[in-house]
Amino acid sequence: MKNVIGLILAGGQGTRLGVLTEKIPKPAVQFGGKYRIIDFTLSNCVNSGIYRIGVLTQYRPHLLNKHIGIGKPWDLDRKGGGVTILQPYSTLTESVWYKGTADAVYQNIEFVDEYNPEYIVVLSGDHIYSMDYSEFVYYHISKGALATIACMEVPITEAHRFGIMVTDIENKIIEFQEKPKNPKSNLASLGIYVFTWNFIKEVLIEDSKDNSSDHDFGKNIIPKILSTGKVYAYPFEGYWQDVGTIQSYWETNLELVRPIPPFNLHDPNWRFYTRSEEMNPAYISENGNVRNSIISEGCEIYGSVENSVISQGVFIDEGAIVKNSVIMTKVEVGKNVIIEDAIIAENTIIKDGCKIGVGHFAESKYDKKVYNSPITVVGMDSIVEENCKIGKNVVIGNDKIVSANTVIDSGGYLI
């Protein structure tokens, strides 16, 4: 698709993921054993024939920049295109972060103009889904649209979390509400757009001069351009998940180990690519026991794993039991450890005899808005010393050391 540029918005923190995004942005969070969340959007681009891509980063971008690099795992290390990391930059008059999603694109008009595209696809880098963007663009063209928004129906009880649209029989959008208290429909924007470039460029320039604007596509740009009569909805019927909360992130990972998972990581016609460290094959010992789980490269399993996603380079020692959990890269689990209903972030060490995620649910004493499920979360680069007992809905921060024999009751925290 030589007349199309892809712009991936990847600067968000993802505050509802708590400690998982304190050190890295949401698009860089691990998913599915070997991937990072942004891998799915990047892979969708190349599978759709879009090879000119800008990734707009902002919050703690170092790991994301390193992960993407020159784009080799996605076949984006090429002349006349490829992937470019686009961070906010200083001018003679100001030095600011992107003020909103629309401002992020506005600040990179020069980058887009270098390729002189007819259309741009604006994408979120923090969702789990597969979509053929070429079909999306062709739909936009067939409608004679100036803007097209990918959408899907959501439960009406969840509609207040999304941009909600009302359409006519031809899918023309006649009304748009950004996160309404009383939604008029359950047709939700996925934050995925196709724009005719010459049109949206002028709209963004005009919006940049409006001091009352939040410079956001959902809040400002889409409502403003509805009057053109050329803004359409693109109904998407495939799999899409936001994974924006602890609960949804955990659930979406564990959906992958169902007998027939709703999201297929193994489709030979739509592969997902990533940058990952070369490791030896996984090893399961004579006494190791694995049931209904993903075990990634470099793992050594001497204990038991059930209904879990185990990322690369994880070591699980003898007598350990891991159930219903997401274990990220290079975690070490000691002898006779029990981990249940938990997320253990990268490079963390759980020493012998610990019990994590045990007991009964209790409300969080730290942050009820973020930590409101039975899931216990242990941040990256932490150490839980021997024989600790940690309940459900507990959060342990990044870079923490939990002293031996510590008891943290359900709903507790160490930040």
From Swiss-Prot:
E.C. number: 2.7.7.27
Keyword presence, Phosphoprotein: no
Record: residues binding alpha-D-glucose 1-phosphate: Y98, G163, E178, K179, S189
Keywords linked to the UniProt accession: ATP-binding, Carbohydrate metabolism, Glycogen biosynthesis, Glycogen metabolism, Nucleotide-binding, Nucleotidyltransferase, Transferase
GO molecular function terms listed in the Swiss-Prot or TrEMBL record: ATP binding; glucose-1-phosphate adenylyltransferase activity
SUPFAM superfamilies assigned: Nucleotide-diphospho-sugar transferases, Trimeric LpxA-like enzymes
Single GO BP term: glycogen biosynthetic process
Pathway assigned in UniProt: Glycan biosynthesis; glycogen biosynthesis
Top-level taxonomic group: Bacteria
Catalytic activity: alpha-D-glucose 1-phosphate + ATP + H(+) = ADP-alpha-D-glucose + diphosphate
InterPro entries assigned to the protein according to its UniProt record, in alphabetical order: ADP-Glc_PPase, ADP_Glu_pyroP_CS, GlgC_bac, GlmU/GlgC-like_hexapep, NTP_transferase_dom, Nucleotide-diphossugar_trans, Trimer_LpxA-like_sf
CDD domains: ADP_Glucose_PP (cd02508), LbH_G1P_AT_C (cd04651)
Family: Belongs to the bacterial/plant glucose-1-phosphate adenylyltransferase family.
Function: Involved in the biosynthesis of ADP-glucose, a building block required for the elongation reactions to produce glycogen. Catalyzes the reaction between ATP and alpha-D-glucose 1-phosphate (G1P) to produce pyrophosphate and ADP-Glc.
Record PANTHER family: GLUCOSE-1-PHOSPHATE ADENYLYLTRANSFERASE, GLUCOSE-1-PHOSPHATE ADENYLYLTRANSFERASE-RELATED
Assembly, per entry: Homotetramer.
HAMAP family hit by this protein: GlgC (MF_00624)
Listed name of the protein: Glucose-1-phosphate adenylyltransferase
Native source species: Fervidobacterium nodosum (strain ATCC 35602 / DSM 5306 / Rt17-B1)
